[in-house]
Amino acid sequence: MQTATKTPWDFLSKYKDIDFSCEWPTVPEMFFITTKRFPERPCFTDFEGEGGSKNTLSYSQVEQKLKELASWLTEKGIQKGDRIAVSGKNSPQWGLVFLASLAAGATICPIDYALHEEEIKNLLNTAKPKFFFVDEEKFPTFDAQNAEYKVYSLSPKFPEKYVYSLKPNSIEHDFQSAKEDDLAAILLQAEQQEIQKA
């Protein structure tokens, strides 16, 4: 008698047709499933607390912030397939923008934060995002531009445009989340020449 081989993803069958409908869950769907399974486990940690102290957010705390930001993006007109760019240091805020953009149905365009501002501008011209979330060192430069995209901060140093300060009028529960065959991300890179490509 042959026994079925267990795989690391066997647990997904419990969530099929409830939390996802395609063959595999998308990144936001997988995040929501993980939150159901481990709501109080640590999800994101940073060291930006008082005196460099550690600040940890649980999956359920990040899920709340994700739903707030995805709802805010939807209220601001983001539709399935619109592009949102993000450039910054590794941080919970960066991860939140990535996940919330996908949950809102947008295509995320991460841009290497180590690039010079002119290189980032060229990549933004190629990507044509509706929103650009950027870290504190480069925020003033991009916020001062008269660009077609709106600029928001990954840093609390700019509270009026800080990602955690962006609150929706109401929280959506049915997001236009991308499906498994939809374009989720465009990885932009600067080449040796002046041409930028997606």
What does each of the following model-derived ranges do?
Residues 4-12, 30-57:
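AMP-dependent adenylate-forming
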Residues 9, 51, 137-183:
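ANL superfamily adenylate-forming
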Residues 23, 40-91, 95-99, 116-121:
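Conserved AMP-binding/adenylate-forming core of the ANL superfamily
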Residues 39-42, 170-195:
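Conserved pre-ATP/AMP-binding loop-to-beta segment of ANL
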Residues 84, 101, 132, 183, ...:
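Conserved S/T- and glycine-rich ATP-binding loop of Class I adenylate-forming
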Residues 98-104, 126:
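Short hydrophobic alpha-helices that are characteristic scaffold elements of the AMP-binding
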Residues 113-143:
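Conserved ATP-dependent adenylate/AMP-binding module captured primarily in the ANL superfamily
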